[in-house]
Amino acid sequence: GYGEVGRILAEDLRAQGVAVAAWDLKLASPASAAPLHDHAGRQGVVLAASAADLAAGSDLVVSAVTASQAVPVAADCASAIRPGAFFLDFNSASPGAKQRAAALVDGAGGRYVEGAVMTSIPPYRIRVPLLLGGSSAARLAPLLNALGFDAKMASERLGVASATKMCRSVIIKGLEAM
């Protein structure tokens, strides 16, 4: 997605000279696409025609979409993902959705990694604390950190990173409510 999270990551990666492409459902509607085109033009981001086109040309796909779109986007990306390319799933989807997305991506030759964003992105931007999970997480963490991310390995098991995030959220929100 090329919403708030996607645009922030694109800005920070482009500031380092990293080539960035993006795709978003909103690109299908001229009215909602205009601000995305404006931002992409200012940042030097290439807008892809589809999620599959984006995946076909990428070594790393960061999926930051709504929970309802997590599996459909993973399926679209899996249809064209490069062998060995990473698919980093930032989505707040259910464990079952994460497992379905992982099966699609890994089954197509990609490397699915669960990414749990541990706090709000805007104040931290690319340095937001991330917990990674999955069998390819240990290989992706140093690559992300070299790009400026603050990524740490949680577990090779899918779901541990997201469960840790959920537990943290329950505690923090509970304390804030007191």
PLM-predicted stretches and their roles:
Residues 168-178:
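Short, intrinsically disordered, charge-balanced linker/junction segments flanking boundaries
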Residues 17, 57-58, 84, 128, ...:
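Short, well-ordered alpha-helix to beta-strand connector turns
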Residues 51-112:
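Rossmann-fold NAD(P) dinucleotide-binding segment
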Residues 93-170:
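Rossmann-fold dinucleotide-binding core
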Residues 1-56, 152:
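NAD(P)+-binding Rossmann beta1-loop-alpha1 motif at the extreme N-terminus of oxidoreductases
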